[in-house]
Amino acid sequence: LEGNTYSRLDTRALIEHGQAAQGKAASETQMILNHKSAIELLVENVQSAGNLDGQGGAAVAGLDRYTLMNLHAALSENLLPNPADEGRVRQHTVEIGHSVFRPLSLPQQIGDALDTLLAKARQIADPFEQAFFMLVHVPYLQPFADINQRTSRLAANVPLFRANLCPLTFVDV
């Protein structure tokens, strides 16, 4: 995870045994626990494309605003300066360091662009192409106050999970 100094061994101890690493910031521990929670959310709510009957009223994660907002909320819990920004479209201007690119700044425009992005993603038949589309376009849009890249990396797994394919794994990102 970007900005996190936990080793793989420390991460494993935290996830499997709840042991926070000594000398690490609480925000780093929270980041890992949030990631675990978001992955669990995906696994619990994604059904393969061949089993979409939704028996038992179970939610089915898809390339939709509901899934994206829930992923962001899980990933950003207790990490953003304003807790109201967790799991909602950005309400303020952001700047990207060392870049002249300026993302959309009006919440209505951001929401409309996000809906368009998700509609385009759903029109893509190939799950690998859908995954790549989400991976690239969510961070470019910057729909959230922060944690856009982490959200896109997990959202990219939705079409893969639904097609019963292995999720993306990033090492040293």
Predicted segments, located by residue:
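FIC/Doc superfamily catalytic core
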Residues: 1-173
